């Protein structure tokens, strides 16, 4: 995914405000052996790009002054109540160094699971992304979580994710192995089932 930015000459609160009034968003590119670079981007183009999941989880080709560099989006600052992006941070990547980043989780097949089909359970997504480490060439756009075998009362954990080759959970996620999805029967459904059982008359 390509992103076009421009070198930013002016800094400070006043300069940032003038850029916002002109439809621009400030940013910075850092990392690697090169000094941090102040940039500005078209706000509307950036706003629409930020709506795409891949913009947050993929390696981006950032073009500044005609030169392209490979980066990851690391931080976005939004206005507290206006639809406005105040600032973005990009990190340069080294193809030979492992990345520590977050990958989105795509949950699949919940509707065909025993939890839903047999028990009318509700499958909840406890987290929507997970921290991973890998080389840039192995970075997945997202990770799939297969829920087809989950049963009522069960939970899936981070280590249950089928990771692609070259991708691993970060050390602390691997150690904690947090819950990523769970299947529970709604309280009302449990009460209804119990009441139905109590109302049954034993056969003579």
From Swiss-Prot:
GO terms for biological process: translation. Pfam families: Ribosomal_L25p, Ribosomal_TL5_C. SUPFAM superfamilies: Ribosomal protein L25-like (SSF50715). One of its GO terms (cellular component) is cytosolic large ribosomal subunit. InterPro entries: Rbsml_bL25/Gln-tRNA_synth_N, Ribosomal_bL25/Gln-tRNA_synth, Ribosomal_bL25_b-dom, Ribosomal_bL25_C, Ribosomal_bL25_long, Ribosomal_L25_dom, Ribosomal_uL5_bac-type. Signal peptide: none annotated. The keyword Transmembrane does not apply. The keyword Ribonucleoprotein applies. Keywords: Ribonucleoprotein, Ribosomal protein, RNA-binding, rRNA-binding. GO terms for molecular function: 5S rRNA binding; structural constituent of ribosome. Part of the 50S ribosomal subunit; part of the 5S rRNA/L5/L18/L25 subcomplex. Contacts the 5S rRNA. Binds to the 5S rRNA independently of L5 and L18. Belongs to the bacterial ribosomal protein bL25 family. CTC subfamily. This is one of the proteins that binds to the 5S RNA in the ribosome where it forms part of the central protuberance. This is Large ribosomal subunit protein bL25. It comes from Burkholderia pseudomallei (strain 668). The lineage of its organism: Bacteria, Pseudomonadati, Pseudomonadota, Betaproteobacteria, Burkholderiales.
């Amino acid at each position: 995914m390509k992103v076009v930015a421009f070198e930013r000459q002016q800094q400070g609160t006043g300069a940032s405000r003038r850029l916002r009034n002109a439809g621009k968003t400030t940013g910075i590119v850092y990392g690697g052996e090169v000094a941090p670079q102040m940039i500005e981007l078209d706000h509307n183009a950036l706003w629409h790009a930020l709506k795409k999941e891949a913009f947050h989880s993929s390696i981006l080709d950032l073009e500044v002054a005609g030169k392209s560099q490979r980066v990851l989006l690391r931080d976005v600052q939004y206005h507290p109540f206006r639809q406005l992006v105040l600032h973005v941070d990009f990190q340069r990547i080294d193809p030979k160094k492992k990345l520590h980043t977050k990958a989105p989780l795509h949950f699949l097949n919940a509707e065909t699971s025993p939890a839903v089909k047999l028990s009318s359970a509700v499958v909840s997504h406890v987290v929507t992304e997970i921290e991973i480490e890998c080389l840039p060439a192995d970075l997945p756009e997202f990770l799939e979580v297969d829920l087809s075998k989950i049963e009522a009362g069960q939970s899936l954990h981070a280590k249950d994710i089928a990771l692609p080759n070259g991708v691993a959970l970060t050390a602390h996620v691997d150690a904690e192995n947090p819950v990523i999805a769970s299947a529970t029967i709604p309280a009302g459904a449990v009460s209804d089932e119990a009441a139905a059982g109590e109302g049954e008359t034993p056969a003579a």
